[in-house]
Amino acid sequence: MPCQDDRMASTAGYTHGLHELDDGCFAYLQPDGGWGWSNAGLIVGDGQSLLVDTLFDLQLTAAMLDSMAAATASCPVDTVVYTHAYGDHWYGIAELARRWPDVASVAATDTEQEMADVPPTMLAARNQAPGEVGELFRSFFGEFHFDGIELVPPTRTFDGRLDLDVGGRRVELFEVGPAHTAGDTIVYVPEARTVYTGDILFIGGTPIVWAGPLSNWIAACDLMLGLDLDTVVPGHGPLTDRAGIVAVRDYL
């Protein structure tokens, strides 16, 4: 059954596009949050910005970056953090690198090692597959464009925890996998009381455990509940708060 709970935040403000959360923190949301329709984030500091994930293909990522143009005009994106290795959170990197060729990319070591497992060429081939297999695959991913995607591996990896300075703003990365995948990272902005969870949180949908163990996922929820926060940006679904974390933890 879906992980839905009255404690979760309302979907009333769940609209496609860029949402400002706090001064300099943004979420890019993609309803309905189903397979491939992931969220991303932008953290703007003094003269520079950090992107939390890209989207599933180049066209979607281009539209997202266009929506961020006003925020990044004087604060270019110089770093992207990958929350995990699945393509809906990083296949758009080439579009980001086209606009900012010197952009650095950061991921947990286990995330980097998993990134080669499902290349976009495989997804492109399955989108063209005949018969029931292709029909089923297109029912999930037929709206995405996997041709012409060039992947850029992370330029920096970390284990455990990494703190970054984004134009004077402290951004804390916590490796919490293996859980959803072999490597999962959450991104926390203490000043803004905001956390970007990647696919550690599916709000309004069922959490998918590709790696596990569940104990790690529950521990990740407990870690987030120990943070001073108001706003929670899930990997899929509408914005939530601490109650959304509790609901996912209790479901698991």
Predicted features by range, described:
Residues 2-9, 124-125, 136-141, 226-228, ...:
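Accessory terminal helices/loops
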Residues 19-72, 185-198:
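Conserved beta-strand hairpin/beta-sheet module of binuclear metal-dependent hydrolase folds
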Residues 24, 43, 53, 68, ...:
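Divalent metal-coordination and catalytic microenvironments
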Residues 37, 58-59, 85-91, 112-116, ...:
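Active-site environment of divalent metal-dependent phosphoester hydrolases
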Residues 52-54, 78-86, 106-109, 176-177, ...:
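Active-site neighborhood of phospho(di)ester-bond hydrolases with catalytic His/Asp-centered motifs
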Residues 70-154, 163:
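Active-site HxH/HxHxD metal-binding segment of metal-dependent hydrolases
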Residues 149-152, 157-189:
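Core dinuclear metal-dependent hydrolase active-site scaffold
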Residues 188, 194, 215-252:
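Divalent-metal (often Zn2+) His-rich catalytic cores of metallo-beta-lactamase-fold enzymes
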